């Protein structure tokens, strides 16, 4: 029996919605990353984008355990001398709450062209509403 390898044109994409209200950040991110990669499907192939679309709502209500809200550090670098910028989740949540979940999921997908392609299927919204009702997404409970 030969090993099955999915072809990109054979992959059928579905839409899923995850409500992140009062859920732990990492638990939501793991579930989203697995669906984006297609690891929940029987046709999973590591080098093919066989994942589905994921909508995460209520990103502003996601929970961090312990003292991570103040102690965890996100760093970025502009490329210029002295261009290192450090943020805590509290600052990021005040400025753009969706970014916390986007960064968490981004760290869980491959850091390649395939991972960037998979990240385009992630839609994160701070509030409870989203503009993708026409796709009839399936709700996922954690």
From Swiss-Prot:
HAMAP family: Ribosomal_uL13
Subunit structure: Part of the 50S ribosomal subunit.
Gene3D superfamilies: Ribosomal protein L13 (3.90.1180.10)
InterPro entries: Ribosomal_uL13 (IPR005822), Ribosomal_uL13_bac-type (IPR005823), Ribosomal_uL13_CS (IPR023563), Ribosomal_uL13_sf (IPR036899)
Function: This protein is one of the early assembly proteins of the 50S ribosomal subunit, although it is not seen to bind rRNA by itself. It is important during the early stages of 50S assembly.
BP term (GO), one: translation
Top-level taxon: Bacteria
Residues of the signal peptide: none
SUPFAM superfamilies in the cross-refs: Ribosomal protein L13
Biological classification of the source: Bacteria, Pseudomonadati, Verrucomicrobiota, Verrucomicrobiia, Verrucomicrobiales
Gene behind the chain: rplM
Gene Ontology MF terms in the entry: mRNA binding; structural constituent of ribosome
A UniProt-annotated Pfam family: Ribosomal_L13
Organism annotation: Akkermansia muciniphila (strain ATCC BAA-835 / DSM 22959 / JCM 33894 / BCRC 81048 / CCUG 64013 / CIP 107961 / Muc)
Family: Belongs to the universal ribosomal protein uL13 family.
The name this protein goes by in its record: Large ribosomal subunit protein uL13
GO CC annotation terms, alphabetical: cytosolic large ribosomal subunit
Keywords: Ribonucleoprotein, Ribosomal protein
């Amino acid at each position: 029996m030969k090993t099955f390898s999915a072809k990109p044109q054979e992959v059928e994409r579905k839409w899923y919605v995850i409500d992140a209200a009062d859920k732990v950040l990492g638990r939501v991110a793991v579930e989203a990353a697995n669906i984006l990669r297609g690891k929940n499907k029987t046709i999973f192939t590591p080098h093919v984008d066989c994942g589905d679309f994921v909508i995460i709502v209520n990103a502003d209500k996601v929970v961090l355990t312990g003292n991570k809200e103040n102690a965890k550090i996100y760093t970025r670098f502009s490329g210029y001398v002295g261009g290192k910028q450090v943020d805590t989740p509290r600052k990021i949540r005040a400025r753009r709450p969706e970014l916390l979940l986007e960064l968490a999921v981004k760290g869980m997908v491959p850091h390649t062209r395939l991972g960037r392609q998979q990240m385009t299927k992630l839609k994160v919204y701070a509030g409870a509403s989203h503009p993708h009702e026409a796709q009839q997404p399936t709700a996922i409970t954690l």
